[in-house]
């Protein structure tokens, strides 16, 4: 049976959304929103959307046939059947107001994802950190095994050139977003929880117990025959395990993990480890990603694939040939500066634990290099709530260029901005950070900072990613030695 024939057979088994033909996305330029929109375009729905700025997501959707408007206006929703809204959109948005007046259904992003998942074999990946990489690894393993899954990922899967794709099988692999508790809409067959930490606490009223209970509720959305795959190394996940009334598969470096990593080593961008599973022979693996945290992400993929009886040969090949995800320890090239060659890496991590894991991976893979980090804090509330943790982790690099906070729409908070954080790190005494008042100034400062052999790491979830790519394209203002292919 050809892929086309398989897809036709699959579509005959999945009911279309009754009366819904025209779907409009408010905030379509986000990775999660754009990914769902792409799947719906490919399913044959008439998709439109709006956002405040053009980006690579909107450009791709336009090429696929979606109608994209830059800017929000009431006229954008006049002829649609349903409006999908992202978390970033508030109730005063003119398109939301117009949709309410026209009695057009308004659904959250996760509700639309849940509809896509409802008649498929869903695999949902949740957790404070590692969701995007874990989802990408699972999608890659399933693809290598010939399962041809549909996937919706919060980052660019480099091998596919996109963050979403409509497959021809019954599998749907997707990130599950806990930031607004909307992952409770999902009803997958397999759920993964990578870890649980205090983040997005405004959603949970500042109550960490409520956050933990919400993760338990997410796992209980599984059917009684479903599988919960959880990281036993995480202390909070271990704590809630007795409350989970579903079949559990654990993974980690811990001796009591069902899927355990042993003999870890890292050389440059790659890791080697042995995986031990109950009832199976040990398997020696090469992972084309750096860091112990990424081995944990790979273990989650191994656990899911093993439960689904995917052949080990697909695991071995998918992990060894994994081409990475955009902005997840992404090597952008090597450049010659007046003082010598430097290496440029870009990473999305913006929580202290994520930044610490990235630093650890960089130290393990390139111990001889001086680590220069250009860090852009993301959200004033996160900077305020995790202030001391940020001071601790950012003090671990050799040279720190600290940008101001990327607000993500939040109002400034006194004492939780880049200048305050810079002062606090300096007072700690380990490091003398350089404050970068405007992103445009970063390129001006680099010539005085960079030395031969440095690893320059641009870090954060804001527009520092675009800035990093601009630095790569302009070769840091110096000469190119070796430049990786840089996706837009």
UniProtKB/Swiss-Prot annotation:
Residues binding ATP, per UniProt: 127-133
UniProt keyword terms in alphabetical order: ATP-binding, Cell cycle, Cell division, Cell shape, Cell wall biogenesis/degradation, Cytoplasm, Ligase, Nucleotide-binding, Peptidoglycan synthesis
Root EC class: ligase
Enzyme Commission number: 6.3.2.8
Record's catalysed reaction(s): UDP-N-acetyl-alpha-D-muramate + L-alanine + ATP = UDP-N-acetyl-alpha-D-muramoyl-L-alanine + ADP + phosphate + H(+)
Ranges that cross the membrane: none
Pfam families linked: Mur_ligase, Mur_ligase_C, Mur_ligase_M
InterPro entries: Mur-like_cat_sf, Mur_ligase_C, Mur_ligase_C_dom_sf, Mur_ligase_cen, Mur_ligase_N, MurCDEF_pg_biosynth, UDP-N-AcMur_Ala_ligase_MurC
Function: Cell wall formation.
Family listed: Belongs to the MurCDEF family.
Protein name: UDP-N-acetylmuramate--L-alanine ligase
Source organism per UniProt: Shewanella sp. (strain W3-18-1)
Gene encoding the protein: murC
């Amino acid at each position: 049976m050809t892929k086309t024939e398989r897809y036709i057979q699959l579509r005959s088994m999945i009911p279309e959304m009754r009366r819904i033909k025209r779907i409009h996305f408010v905030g379509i330029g986000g990775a999660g929103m754009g990914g769902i929109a792409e799947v719906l375009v490919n399913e044959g729905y008439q998709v439109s959307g709006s956002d405040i700025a053009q980006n690579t997501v909107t450009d791709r959707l336009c090429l696929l046939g979606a109608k994209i408007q830059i800017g929000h206006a009431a006229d954008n929703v006049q002829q649609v059947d349903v409006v999908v809204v992202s978390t970033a959109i508030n109730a005063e948005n003119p398109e939301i107001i117009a949709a309410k007046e026209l009695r057009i259904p308004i659904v959250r992003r996760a509700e639309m994802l849940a509809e896509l998942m409802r008649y498929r074999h869903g695999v949902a990946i949740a957790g404070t950190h590692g969701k995007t990489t874990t989802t990408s690894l699972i999608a890659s393993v399933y693809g290598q095994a010939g399962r041809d899954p549909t996937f919706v990922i919060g980052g660019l899967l480099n091998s596919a050139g996109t963050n979403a794709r409509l497959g021809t099988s019954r599998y749907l692999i997707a990130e599950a977003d806990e930031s607004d508790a909307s992952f409770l809409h999902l009803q997958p067959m397999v759920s993964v929880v990578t870890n649980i930490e205090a983040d997005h606490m405004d959603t949970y009223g500042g109550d960490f117990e409520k956050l933990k209970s919400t993760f338990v509720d997410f796992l209980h959305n599984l059917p009684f025959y479903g599988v919960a795959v959880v990281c036993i190394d995480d202390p909070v996940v271990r704590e809630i395990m007795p409350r989970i009334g579903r079949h559990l598969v654990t993974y980690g470096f811990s001796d009591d993990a069902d899927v355990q990593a042993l003999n870890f080593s890292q050389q440059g961008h790659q890791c080697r480890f042995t995986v031990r599973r109950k009832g199976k022979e040990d398997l020696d693996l090469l992972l084309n990603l750096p860091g112990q945290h990424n081995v944990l992400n790979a273990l989650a993929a191994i656990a899911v694939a093993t439960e689904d009886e995917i052949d080990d040969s697909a695991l071995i090949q998918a992990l060894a040939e994994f081409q990475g995800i955009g902005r997840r320890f992404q090597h952008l090239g090597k450049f010659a500066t007046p003082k010598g060659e430097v290496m440029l890496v870009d990473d999305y991590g913006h929580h202290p634990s994520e930044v610490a894991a990235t630093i650890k991976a960089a130290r393990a893979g390139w111990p001889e290099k001086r680590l220069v980090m250009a860090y852009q804090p993301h959200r004033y509330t996160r900077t305020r709530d995790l202030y001391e943790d940020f001071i601790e982790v950012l003090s671990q690099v050799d040279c720190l260029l600290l940008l101001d906070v990327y607000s993500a729409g939040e109002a400034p908070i006194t004492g939780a901005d880049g200048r305050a954080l810079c002062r606090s790190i300096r007072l700690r005494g380990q490091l003398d950070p350089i404050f970068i008042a405007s992103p445009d100034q970063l390129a001006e400062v680099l010539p005085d900072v960079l030395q031969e052999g440095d690893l320059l790491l641009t870090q954060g979830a804001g527009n520092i990613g675009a800035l990093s790519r601009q630095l790569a394209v302009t070769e840091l203002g110096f000469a190119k030695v070796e430049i990786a292919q840089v996706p837009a």
